[in-house]
Every structure is written in structure tokens, then in C-alpha cells.
From Swiss-Prot:
Keywords annotated in UniProt: Cytoplasm, DNA damage, DNA recombination, DNA repair, DNA-binding
Source organism: Rhodospirillum centenum (strain ATCC 51521 / SW)
Lineage start: Bacteria, Pseudomonadati, Pseudomonadota, Alphaproteobacteria, Rhodospirillales
Purpose: The RuvA-RuvB-RuvC complex processes Holliday junction (HJ) DNA during genetic recombination and DNA repair, while the RuvA-RuvB complex plays an important role in the rescue of blocked DNA replication forks via replication fork reversal (RFR). RuvA specifically binds to HJ cruciform DNA, conferring on it an open structure. The RuvB hexamer acts as an ATP-dependent pump, pulling dsDNA into and through the RuvAB complex. HJ branch migration allows RuvC to scan DNA until it finds its consensus sequence, where it cleaves and resolves the cruciform DNA.
GO molecular function: ATP binding; four-way junction DNA binding; four-way junction helicase activity
Domain III: region residues: 154-206
Entry's Gene Ontology BP terms: DNA recombination; DNA repair
Subcellular location(s) of the protein: Cytoplasm
Domain commentary: Has three domains with a flexible linker between the domains II and III and assumes an 'L' shape. Domain III is highly mobile and contacts RuvB.
SUBUNIT field: Homotetramer. Forms an RuvA(8)-RuvB(12)-Holliday junction (HJ) complex. HJ DNA is sandwiched between 2 RuvA tetramers; dsDNA enters through RuvA and exits via RuvB. An RuvB hexamer assembles on each DNA strand where it exits the tetramer. Each RuvB hexamer is contacted by two RuvA subunits (via domain III) on 2 adjacent RuvB subunits; this complex drives branch migration. In the full resolvosome a probable DNA-RuvA(4)-RuvB(12)-RuvC(2) complex forms which resolves the HJ.
Name this polypeptide is given: Holliday junction branch migration complex subunit RuvA
GO cellular component, one term: cytoplasm
Pfam families according to UniProt: HHH_5, RuvA_C, RuvA_N
Ranges for region Domain I: 1-64
Xref: NCBIfam families: ruvA
Gene name per UniProt: ruvA
Amino acid sequence: MIAKLTGLLDSTGLDWAIVDVGGVGYLVSASARTLRRLAAPGEAVSLLTEMWVSEDNIQLFGFADTEERDWFRLLTTVQGVGARVALNLLSALSPAELTNSIAAQDRTALCQADGVGPKLAARILNELKEKVASFGAPAPAAATAGKGGAAPAGPAGAVADAVSALVNLGYRRVEAFTAVNAVAQRLGPEAGVSDLIRAGLKELSP
């Protein structure tokens, strides 16, 4: 198992890089985010890697950091998400944006990635919504309505209502969710919906 490559960058393409390690060139598939962070050809690079072995192929996938690698592993546990789609998601959204998008159940954000349609996005949201807490996301209950479409009672309900209000004002769900959860942590459980909306708007102001 190859877990890390350290060598000289030979060349790059739209979704790959070749790393020269002791005179051997390793072809590594990578996200656009990782490729942007690489040094110039001829300079030293270091990539964390995942190696997939099949009957007729060996593939290496490279990552700039452990967070992106861990997201790749998690995404590929979802049915219908192969390595290519996982890298497309990591190209379209940073790990932090992925975390917040899934916690906020923001299907539109996931559909920015090539190869991700509404049905696959919904499956990703459903299968990973309980797992994003390990990546530092707020509890999913804060972003979703209760049974029958009503927001849950208590602080989570106030957060959900405030997020919905900001979305109705034209903000993207993921940015509304991120802003409201940030101010909810500062204001505490006594904050009402109107308090969260006002503070959320200030958080979103440039």
C-alpha cells in the first residue's frame, strides 16, 4: 500500500499529476484543489495517497491534506460515488464547504460537481448527514425541519426557522446555515428566531 509520495513534480494535467520518486514517475489522480496547491514542475512535492487495486488496474489518488483524503474515503462509501465523482466533489467544494453543505442538506451545492445530479446528491445527503459531525459540523437537526415539515421545538427549531428565513431572502442554504449556526453559538440557547435572523444578516454582510 502506497500511503504517501514525496518527490519532484514532473508534470500536471486537468485531473492528474506525475510525481518523480527516485526516477520512477507515479501517475496520481487528484482534485483541482490539490493540483492548485502543488509546486512548479521540477520542485519538491508531497502527497498523501490512496491506492485502489483491481484485477486489471492500479490507481493512485493524491491529496494535499488529511482532511481531503478523509472526505474522499467517506464519499466513496456512498453507492454511486466512485473515485471520479468524489474528486469532482472535492474540486467543486472544499472540505469545509462539503461539511456545511451536507449538514445543511444543501442539494444544490453538491450538484455543482460534474457527475452529481439531484438523485445522487440526495443520496449523499441522506447517507452522510449523521457522519459529518466527525468533520466538525453542527448537528443535522439544526438544519432540518421536523416531521410534517415543521421545525423542531427549542434552539434547533429557532436555527432552522432562521435559516429558512435567510434562504427566502435569497441567500444560499449552506451560507445561511453556516452564518446562523455561528451566531447561535455566540448568542446561546435563549436566542429567538428574530435574534438569529438579525445576527445572521450581520454575519453575511460584506
